[in-house]
Regions:
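Intrinsically disordered, low-complexity Pro/Gly/Ser/Thr-rich segments with frequent PxxP/GP/PP motifs
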Residues: 113-140, 201-230
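N-terminal Sec-pathway targeting helices
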Residues: 3-20
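Asparagine-centered strand-capping/turn motif at beta-strand->loop junctions
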Residues: 92-98, 176-182, 195
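Hydrophobic single-pass membrane-insertion segments
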Residues: 27-37
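Short acidic/proline- and small/hydrophobic-mixed sequence motifs that coincide with surface turns
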Residues: 98-103, 182-187, 200-202
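Low-complexity, acidic Ser/Thr/Pro/Gly-rich terminal tails and inter-domain linkers that flank the onset
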Residues: 36-86, 148-171
Length: 241
């Protein structure tokens, strides 16, 4: 499902004579606002910092809202490298809709270049910190000429963690999975997880691990999950068979 919203956003921000370029440029050099919550372990390991965070609250398709914009220093999560970077352009996006967003691209256009953000697996009521896909750095005073949400896709059916079948315990670098039914589960079990703290998800990326061949009744298996931590990871959904 794809839908562009650039023109609609511009009309919305022109109400009262306030142009989009002016309204969003203010977000890029205004006084710092309240930063999102940080995962405790990751904050200590990578000295995550949010700077010049300013509220935007710009509506996008399917209930998405561009919530904040600013600068991020810490682990770069979007390509799985966890490389420590400084002053990366970031946005936070909230899902005010009633369905989980499977994928969306957020494009923030300037006079000379476009910042690109991608999100996966954003449930209703959740917010996510997104880092610019090409590691674009934050520069105060940039003017924004357009904001789009493109290639927005919703899950055809709401995803499930299958809590009636599986118990999944995140650990540091591992996931422990137990079949809590009285029957064998045949076929692969694929577990999707994200980094999180409180109500904030971190990174557009959704990680996954596979339990090949399923689990026998009552069986527990531990599998390597390189980006997982006991305190800072959340199971988003699981597919069975």
């Amino acid at each position: 499902m794809s839908r562009k919203m650039k023109q609609k956003n511009m009309r919305w921000l022109l109400i009262g004579g306030t142009a989009l370029a002016v309204a969003v440029a203010l977000c890029l050099w205004a006084k710092p606002g309240q930063p999102p919550d940080l995962p405790a372990e990751e904050a200590q390991e990578s000295t995550i910092r949010f700077e010049e965070v300013q509220s935007a609250e710009i509506p996008l398709p399917h209930g998405l809202v561009l919530q904040d914009i600013g600068s991020y220093t810490g682990m770069y999560m979007e390509d799985g490298s966890n490389e420590i970077l400084s002053n990366i352009l970031m946005v936070t996006v909230r899902n005010d809709g009633d369905r989980t967003v499977q994928y969306a691209e957020i494009l923030v256009s300037g006079e000379e270049e476009t910042a690109r953000f991608a999100l996966t697996t954003l449930p209703p009521g959740q917010s996510v910190v997104l880092l610019e896909q090409n590691r674009m750095t934050y520069e105060g005073g940039r003017q924004v000429t357009g904001i789009e949400a493109d290639n927005v896709a919703l899950f055809p059916e709401e995803p499930s963690v299958h809590a009636d079948k599986l118990e999944v315990l995140p650990g540091n670098g591992v996931l422990k999975v137990t079949n809590i039914t009285g029957e064998d589960i045949s076929g692969d079990i694929v577990i999707y997880y994200k980094n999180a703290s409180s109500d904030m998800l971190y990174g557009g990326i959704t990680y996954r691990v596979t339990i090949a061949g399923g689990l026998k009744a009552g069986e527990t298996r531990q599998t390597v999950a390189g980006h997982c931590s006991a305190a800072g990871s959340r199971i988003m959904f699981i597919t069975v068979g």
